[in-house]
Amino acid sequence: MATWNRPHPRLPVAPEPVAEGESQQPLGRELSEANRFAYAALCGISLSQLFPEPEQSSFCSEFVTGLVKWLHLSETVLPTMMAFASGLGGKGDDIFAQTLLKDPILKDNPSAISQDLLSFSLKDGHYDARARVLVCHVISLLQVPMEELDILEEVFLESLKDAKEEESETAEESRKRKEKRRKWKRYLLIGLATVGGGTVIGVTGGLAAPLVAAGAATIIGSAGAAALGSVAGIAVMTSLFGAAGAGLTGYKMKKRVGAIEEFMFLPLTDGKQLHITIAITGWLGSGRYRTFNAPWMALARSQEQYCLAWEAKYLMELGNALETILSGLANMVAQEALKYTVLSGIVAALTLPASLLSVANVIDNPWGVCLHRSAEVGKHLAHILLSRQQGRRPVTLIGFSLGARVIYFCLQEMAQEQDCQGIIEDVVLLGAPVEGDPKYWEPFRNVVSGRIINGYCRGDWLLSFVYRTSSVQLRVAGLQPVLLQDRRMENVDLSSVVNGHLDYAKKMDVILKAVGIRTKPGWSEKGLPLAPGGLPQEEPLQPATVSTDETIHQDEQKQGPAPGDSLKSAIPSSASQAQVPAGLDQSTEDSLPAAAAPAEGHLVCSHGVGPNPLGCPDCTRETQESCAELD
């Protein structure tokens, strides 16, 4: 829905400050009546397209009703707008968007609609995830860069901070930028004040209300500042950012909850934002990957980001087991790969190499323990989010391996509650050891407002091995697409990026870019910060394949992907990459024998996956279905 990697966004054009004594009203009301109608109709039709589920109908109706009043439209147009929100308006959103762009006010500054719609969405002190998804959709129709929404949200926060930024010595450009921001602060706050002296909505969180009100007096006048310092204003700020503004950093598990021994949020950034991101690590390794925040150093989804610290002792045991099994079996697996190239049918029938089964006890116990605990942690996370510990603002969840499993069970738990809507904006599950059957993902449509991203790798033999030794599930989301028929569902084939399960931690920067999540500039593909001008000289990676549910469904009906198919496995160009467990450390990979690289011309299965010790996941599923007696 949003494109995050855009260079140097421009600041929105700031309107001239309103002179003292002049009437102040939201920008939307300054449009002509016809364009106010087009504005409301655009939002109504967009809501029907984004949230057609019956469970979302009340939100759509309330949003449209409030918007009609916000724009001072006649009540006679309300039935028409309700019809649009119910899906009776067809797909005419682009027509209304083009009509708006012809308005004299918006012709040179289409981002003004973003400001007005954001002001309306925040007027009650709540920032519903569905409202943010709608704002993103509308500004994309108006061809406004998504970065401008981030700037607008940032300006809303800055507008109520009583902090005077010092001008740098290089300064003219910085000074002009700040002047533009000051103009926007004042203009945006007009939209946050109700005509007639109603409550002004503050969105700072964690700041003393009287101090904030004092700083705001110079921007919005003494009357508005008095309202901001009132009990109602403080209540709204608390609602948006959580109790006492502490948010997630203020949460600590006071006592053991069920089987959970450790659960806390660690800040990845120092900033505040109107939407937050929570990253969840799947295991703890050795060296630089022994901390929870190590894989997420390049993440830049929002200015307020956290990582979840959970069950460190058990995740460390799991990480050690993963590294042990990989380093100890490197030579054996490489040789087994050659042996089973021709006998892939036997392997697909779950007749695993005896040498693999002999070391299963190394990984089975810590893996089984973490499988259970990740489910409990996910349920606990769901209750925290449902209690609005983070405040009333959108949340994005990103996790890999067992961290993705935490997200899966969090969504599953939230889906059972009636008030689960409007909290989660996007979720990203990478290499998830969870059920891939779409019937298990269907309830998530009621929880997630934006995107449900499933990043998978068909050749992840380690995930195939460890998960199938502890579960009878044959369709694993981390190994293949989830065929959920919904606009939210996005499947991203990471086979060209992820060579082994441990790559999810080691190549997180590249993976985030592949799934469309913004990252910090100046980070190498291995997750290491780069010195200026120190870009690594590497061969470009093949782009990961992004597929929608419709494309996948068509592909499933074929015998195998043809060269021109829209969905195809992004397998490495070198056959050796499909053979050698690439999750190994570099030192281990260098010591692999020459036999690890199979000869050219080995057969590739009908699903496009080269031979590996466990065979193709799809082949395994097909064979297992025909041999149900095998366990």
Swiss-Prot record:
<feature type="transmembrane region" description="Helical">
    <location>
        <begin position="228"/>
        <end position="248"/>
    </location>
</feature>
<feature type="transmembrane region" description="Helical">
    <location>
        <begin position="343"/>
        <end position="363"/>
    </location>
</feature>
<keyword id="KW-0812">Transmembrane</keyword>
<comment type="similarity">
    <text>Belongs to the TMCO4 family.</text>
</comment>
<feature type="region of interest" description="Disordered">
    <location>
        <begin position="523"/>
        <end position="631"/>
    </location>
</feature>
<dbReference type="GO" id="GO:0016020">
    <property type="term" value="C:membrane"/>
</dbReference>
<keyword id="KW-1133">Transmembrane helix</keyword>
<feature type="transmembrane region" description="Helical">
    <location>
        <begin position="204"/>
        <end position="220"/>
    </location>
</feature>
<feature type="transmembrane region" description="Helical">
    <location>
        <begin position="187"/>
        <end position="203"/>
    </location>
</feature>
<dbReference type="InterPro" id="IPR007941">
    <property type="entry name" value="DUF726"/>
</dbReference>
<protein>
    <recommendedName>
        <fullName>Transmembrane and coiled-coil domain-containing protein 4</fullName>
    </recommendedName>
</protein>
<feature type="coiled-coil region">
    <location>
        <begin position="153"/>
        <end position="183"/>
    </location>
</feature>
<feature type="compositionally biased region" description="Polar residues">
    <location>
        <begin position="571"/>
        <end position="590"/>
    </location>
</feature>
<keyword id="KW-0175">Coiled coil</keyword>
<feature type="region of interest" description="Disordered">
    <location>
        <begin position="1"/>
        <end position="26"/>
    </location>
</feature>
<dbReference type="Pfam" id="PF05277">
    <property type="entry name" value="DUF726"/>
</dbReference>
<dbReference type="InterPro" id="IPR029058">
    <property type="entry name" value="AB_hydrolase_fold"/>
</dbReference>
<keyword id="KW-0472">Membrane</keyword>
